[in-house]
Amino acid sequence: MASKAIFFFFVSAVCLSSLAGVAIADADDFDRFQIQGSVYCDTCRVQFVTRLSKFLEGAKVKLECRSRTNGTVTLTKEAVTDKTGSYRMEVTGDHEEEVCELVLVESPDSGCSDVSKEAYLRNAAKISLTANDGIVSHETRIVNPLGFMVQTPSAECPAAFKELGIVPDVTF
């Protein structure tokens, strides 16, 4: 009878120590984030992806985090897109007290290199880099696609908009 109690105690101790190791590993992951996004050429100058958009290989983006209180830059990191127009970067540390956003830096296509300066578009690239935000997937953050624009919209844009059932406030 005593040997069964010792065996049960030993098995319980092994199981509990295994769970403690998993909890520690998960706690370490809370301050490590994988950021994923993409960069495209906005051939219609509408700031959303259409069937005419082209994803850009070799585009540079920058992650910048600033203090909420004084605006001091606390983190800067750059990434370059692959052949599918996608980029990935890993960030460590909890940035709950900071405003973090991804911005376009450089386009590989000189014919598609305009960046909108509209304030509402900068909000589209903001990202939460804290585990204390209610997001279930605490490790991966997916950013809205960012787009460089051409100087003059493509002549095919009105047809693409008609297919979508929209008529944007754009002069062609």
UniProtKB/Swiss-Prot annotation:
Keywords noted in UniProt: Disulfide bond, Glycoprotein, Secreted, Signal
Positions glycosylated per UniProt: 70
Disulfide bond residue pairs: 41-112, 44-157, 65-100
Keyword rRNA processing assigned: no
Signal peptide: 1-27
InterPro entries: Allergen_Ole_e_I_CS, Pollen_Ole_e1_allergen
Subcellular location: Secreted
Recorded GO CC terms: extracellular space
This protein's record includes keyword Cytoplasm: no
Family as reported in the entry's similarity comment: Belongs to the Ole e I family.
Protein name: Pollen-specific protein-like At4g18596
